[in-house]
């Protein structure tokens, strides 16, 4: 199995390095990751400037100023030859639960892999300690995929409790929960008296029902949520069509 491995925490982050070491026990792994932390970069792609890369002695590649999406795009189309069998993103430091997936560079890297035609997995740890647990779970999933491919055309968003492996209760297939909107901004003043602003933490849980990713991880289970690239709200099609007719928009053209 040939794996393109990326993340949004940066090429030297403990999550990606722990996972790369574990995956190399049974797979051919090429790391292509940002040269710095790009958390929250979502699906951003660098279009107005060129990208440089740096290859380390172990073969890992850092994309200078690159986003997670840049890294996967370059990895698939230029840097990994032969091309990968699957794109894996992670292990993220901290969870990507509920509407975190909208902002997540970790999920975006997997999404870019799927957009380019490859199976894709995004892996996050609900904390900052037991990366070995998340690595073991990821290896088990990938071994399963090598035995029997999952033909859903979906991204698997995997969130792992920050626990020793022996304390993991199992795996649940879940849906995304949701958070209350984040609204905290943290102002600071620089030495020259100018105001600086920091984006605050994510909002509290809003929908954390029993079938959500939030609930699974809180209860000690690995959460696996299938995601897809198509953002169309198909169930709203007729509602929007009827609304356009009722307000008369478009009838003059």
UniProtKB/Swiss-Prot annotation:
It holds the Pfam family SurE. It is found in: Cytoplasm. The lineage of its organism: Bacteria, Pseudomonadati, Pseudomonadota, Gammaproteobacteria, Enterobacterales. SUPFAM superfamilies: SurE-like. InterPro entries: SurE, SurE-like_Pase/nucleotidase, SurE-like_sf. It catalyses: a ribonucleoside 5'-phosphate + H2O = a ribonucleoside + phosphate; a ribonucleoside 3'-phosphate + H2O = a ribonucleoside + phosphate; [phosphate](n) + H2O = [phosphate](n-1) + phosphate + H(+). This is 5'/3'-nucleotidase SurE. The keyword Chaperone does not apply. Nucleotidase with a broad substrate specificity as it can dephosphorylate various ribo- and deoxyribonucleoside 5'-monophosphates and ribonucleoside 3'-monophosphates with highest affinity to 3'-AMP. Also hydrolyzes polyphosphate (exopolyphosphatase activity) with the preference for short-chain-length substrates (P20-25). Might be involved in the regulation of dNTP and NTP pools, and in the turnover of 3'-mononucleotides produced by numerous intracellular RNases (T1, T2, and F) during the degradation of various RNAs. Binds 1 divalent metal cation per subunit. Gene3D superfamilies: Survival protein SurE-like phosphatase/nucleotidase (3.40.1210.10). It comes from Salmonella paratyphi B (strain ATCC BAA-1250 / SPB7). Belongs to the SurE nucleotidase family. GO terms for cellular component: cytoplasm. The gene is surE. One of its GO terms (molecular function) is exopolyphosphatase activity.
